[in-house]
């Protein structure tokens, strides 16, 4: 009889532990979902999307790199101004001030897997009509058509995120706009080259994705990319 009571007690403990584990998982999942919806204004404000200045409040290091890059002045630099006859030619704007590379001018989202992005022509990318001085900003490369911020990593964030590691680690992403360079790159790979655009133009850096409190406490250091382009 004593052995039966011991066995019964063990089964009860295991059931209780399983219930606690499931409850903890559900609690954490619900908590993460609540956190993701904490600041919806970080991904959309009416008809406009927030600019890179909003991103700088948390992604301090990345913003400071981007603001000194050629992507940040893709609209304001003198060469672009002259070549477009003082911004008269509008067909270039999709790549120089993109609303997001994940949406075409027709409003249709690009292939969510990222595969179809390489066939999206630069003149088909929807250009934005606001915050032009930001050039190719954060949202241009990271904001999806359904207002989720995509990137190569996942993590707890006050806005919706989506991990698309394959897309952000391949040269096809850069080839959406850098079409002439992409042709040179394809010739390079046909000759046996293996390095991606990111490996050369976005050096690896080990750091936390976020530098602001309290969010940085929720992130471990990991290998990311410098946004100096």
Describe the residue ranges of each PLM region.
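Hydrophobic core
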Residues: 22-27
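Primarily the internal scaffold of c-type cytochrome electron-transfer domains
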Residues: 34-46, 63-83, 87, 101-229
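Signature of short aromatic-glycine-proline-rich micro-motifs recurring in repeat-based ectodomains
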Residues: 92-93
């Amino acid at each position: 009889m004593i052995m039966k009571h011991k066995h019964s007690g063990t089964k009860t403990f295991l059931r209780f532990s399983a219930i606690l584990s499931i409850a903890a998982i559900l609690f954490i999942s619900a908590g993460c979902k609540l956190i993701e919806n904490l600041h919806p204004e970080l991904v959309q404000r009416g008809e406009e999307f927030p600019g890179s200045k909003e991103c700088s409040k948390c992604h301090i290091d990345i913003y400071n790199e981007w603001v000194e890059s050629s992507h940040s002045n893709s609209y304001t630099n003198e060469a672009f101004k002259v070549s477009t006859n003082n911004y008269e030619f509008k067909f270039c704007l999709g790549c120089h001030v993109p609303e997001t590379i994940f949406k075409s001018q027709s409003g249709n989202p690009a292939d969510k897997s990222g595969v179809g992005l390489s066939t999206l022509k630069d003149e088909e990318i929807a250009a934005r009509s606001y915050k032009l001085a930001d050039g190719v900003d954060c949202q241009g490369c990271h904001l999806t058509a359904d207002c989720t911020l995509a990137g190569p990593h996942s993590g707890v964030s006050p806005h919706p995120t989506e991990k698309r590691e394959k897309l952000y680690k391949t040269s096809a992403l850069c080839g959406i706009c850098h079409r002439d360079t992409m042709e040179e790159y394809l010739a390079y790979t046909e000759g046996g080259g293996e390095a991606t655009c990111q490996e050369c133009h976005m050096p690896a850096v080990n750091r936390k994705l976020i530098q602001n409190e309290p969010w940085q406490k929720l992130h471990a250091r990991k290998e990311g990319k410098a946004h100096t382009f």
